[in-house]
Amino acid sequence: MTRLLTHPDIAWREDGTPFATAFGDVYFSAQDGLAETRAVFFKGCGLPEAWAGRAQFTVAETGFGTGLNFLALWQLWREHRPHPAARLSFVSFEGYPLRAEDAARAFAAWPELSPLADQLLARWPGPVRGVRHLAFEADGIELILHLGDIAQTLPASGFRADAWFLDGFSPAKNAGMWAGDIFPLIAARSAPGARAATFTVAGDVRRGLAEAGFEVRKAEGHGRKRQRLEAVYPDADEPVIPLPRRVAILGAGIAGATIASGLKLAGMEAVVFDPAPEPARGASGNALALMMPRLDAGDTAEARLLIDAYLAARDFYLGRPGAELTDVRQMPRNETEEKRFGKLLADPPFPLEDLEALSGGGILHKRALILRPRQMVLSLLDGVEVRAGAMPDVDLGARSVNGEVFDAIVLASGMGMGQLLPALELAGRQGQVEHLSGAVQAPPSALASGTYAIALGNERLWGATFEPAGEGVSAAVSEAARAENLEGVEALSPWWVREAQGGAAVSRASVRATTPDRLPLIGAAPDAGAIAALWDGKAERASSPVLPGVYVAGGFGSRGFTWAPWAAAIIAAKLCNGPPPADLNSLRAVDPARQILRRLRKTGRL
């Protein structure tokens, strides 16, 4: 199995309908696919009436195809959004993603959708396995697209849908999408009273839904199809959990800023606390930052997690103030790394639009980003209340900050998290960079080989060191680190040596919070004492007690700008009772409780 998914071969019929040659079926009805979506799925799931008065509504779909159902639903949501802060999540599964040009050709049949189609096509995901997250903030709608074989991606997902669009190709031509073991998975991911709709009335589908617990009935079909199916999952009396209204966020760096921005869009009042006199004074305060992927040669769960986070971050930053596209030339540091690059390029995790081999054994990372951190952080905090300049007095048990009670608290303060949750394993690593402003303007560019060097306009930045920081969260510049950075630049190119030596560079050091396994801590804050009390030598992470209303987003190391948007989306999903933009393997990998459970397994003690 290759790391990249296969694009489907499309044949275009005379009436403009796309036809999947591998499956021998059309992507939508020749009798107006948009009308079919409305008649089969909207009517079958009771939309838009079903989301009236809801703060969060989730629609799931089997078979993303051209994306027509998503566009039509987006249009309906814009017309019937319950209130300005309401959120609509669309979770879809696709094993053979279309090329953007094929999707554009399909959308051309409906000019009324073009304003939305243009937005989707501008961010169209490539054929990269994993979970893509596209948030269209102005309309409060998000697309969470699980790319890969549904037999693997659906069991690995964790969410509850209020409505299901069952829209794979015909069961006779795409049996895997309608396999018997799919229906129990759909039921397990259905909220009480969830409705499902599909164009087919095949007996296996009717029986599969019924055996999974749905009440199934036939309804009048669309076009040439005389009938379709509607199904309802049993309702249940569940307590309505009110969404948090006021959330305290500790930390005004990129982690806190992305979280605050997302919660504000969800209609919550976010208050950010930071002991520094102003935002972006810590590890998020360098003049420039480089965001490029960390790619592993193997197709592991961790490798996919890193790719998911990087692509989510790139999509999040593009178009915002302080973000510039760039190519990064990365050269191997040694023979071992050169072999790793070769293995990586033999089965690349990205298409050629993003990744290319360089002579000399290097890699060209296309469409990476140069960021202006302070500008980005301040733009995200626009309209958010920030209380800076004093160390806040925090009581996690009472969910209070300086005596003021909040509905939830999010810890996004880097090394400061360890003072409030001492059971977390965090180690400080000091990083020093050198920055100068010169007279010569340069287009966005970057080199990397252990050290990285960034040019943007008249600014140059290079570094960074990565050394133990000792106790505390303070950092100090040093001549030794400055010399190390200059030595790193000398290995990059003669041009950069001249740039580095041609002006008065200013050194800046900051402390970054890291974890032993190099993965971040994202999710509910674990209750270490309660976990230890329940420990029986085989406790499962899913049952680990947590501190009510307390969440963690940190341990990002030197990749804070990569992890932050992905982490913010996960925290927002938890607070809004929405679907996470990640699979269960990824969520387990970053669950803060993993550290406590690992210690208990190893030593039997906290």
UniProtKB/Swiss-Prot annotation:
One of its GO terms (molecular function) is oxidoreductase activity, acting on the CH-NH group of donors. Residues 250-606 are annotated as: FAD-dependent cmnm(5)s(2)U34 oxidoreductase. Its cofactor is FAD. This is tRNA 5-methylaminomethyl-2-thiouridine biosynthesis bifunctional protein MnmC. GO terms for biological process: methylation; tRNA wobble base modification. In the N-terminal section; belongs to the methyltransferase superfamily. tRNA (mnm(5)s(2)U34)-methyltransferase family. In the C-terminal section; belongs to the DAO family. Its EC number is 2.1.1.61, 1.5.-.-. GO terms for cellular component: cytoplasm. Pfam families: DAO, Methyltransf_30. Catalyzes the last two steps in the biosynthesis of 5-methylaminomethyl-2-thiouridine (mnm(5)s(2)U) at the wobble position (U34) in tRNA. Catalyzes the FAD-dependent demodification of cmnm(5)s(2)U34 to nm(5)s(2)U34, followed by the transfer of a methyl group from S-adenosyl-L-methionine to nm(5)s(2)U34, to form mnm(5)s(2)U34. It catalyses: 5-aminomethyl-2-thiouridine(34) in tRNA + S-adenosyl-L-methionine = 5-methylaminomethyl-2-thiouridine(34) in tRNA + S-adenosyl-L-homocysteine + H(+). InterPro entries: FAD-dep_OxRdtase (IPR006076), FAD/NAD-bd_sf (IPR036188), MnmC-like_methylTransf (IPR008471), SAM-dependent_MTases_sf (IPR029063), tRNA_MAMT_biosynth_bifunc_MnmC (IPR023032), tRNA_MNMC2 (IPR047785), tRNA_S-uridine_synth_MnmC_C (IPR017610).
